[in-house]
A protein has these predicted regions:
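Short, conserved sequence motifs used for protein processing/export or organelle targeting and
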Residues: 1-124
Length: 124
């Protein structure tokens, strides 16, 4: 809901192999482009530097949401729903909906291997 700044996220996590582990779903809110000062290698400051993929929030916490902490088999599907209030773009234009994306990934917490990741743009 763009007008209320409320973001509703529905995820479906499908496994295509039999695996054993401690799997977590992690969702980050990122700003695609932020123009802000940056100190350069030569010591000068570029006041209009374009920063890309700026981490802005962890939607479901640092370690995410537990998907499964035992064995999964080919065909297992896990569903999760989240809601998140987006920062107000009238006070910081970098939070305009067309500049926001979600990076979602599945991580095995014991060894921190990432099984799959996807970037979803929120605008357009």
């Amino acid at each position: 809901d763009v007008y209320k700044r409320q973001l509703f996220i529905h995820t479906e996590t499908s496994f295509y192999n039999t695996l054993s582990g401690n799997y977590h779903l992690i969702i980050y809110l990122i700003r695609n482009d932020v123009v802000s000062p940056q100190k350069m290698n030569d010591g000068t400051i570029d006041h209009h530097y374009h920063h890309h993929a700026v981490l802005s929030n962890n939607i479901n916490g640092t370690w995410g949401t537990l998907v499964n902490d035992s064995a999964v088999v080919n065909g297992d599907v896990f569903y999760h729903d989240f809601s998140f209030e987006l920062p107000d773009s009238s006070t910081d234009s970098t939070y305009e909906i067309n500049n926001l994306s979600l990076v979602t990934y599945i991580c095995e917490r014991n060894n921190f291997n990432i099984l799959q990741a996807i970037k979803t743009e929120l605008g357009n």
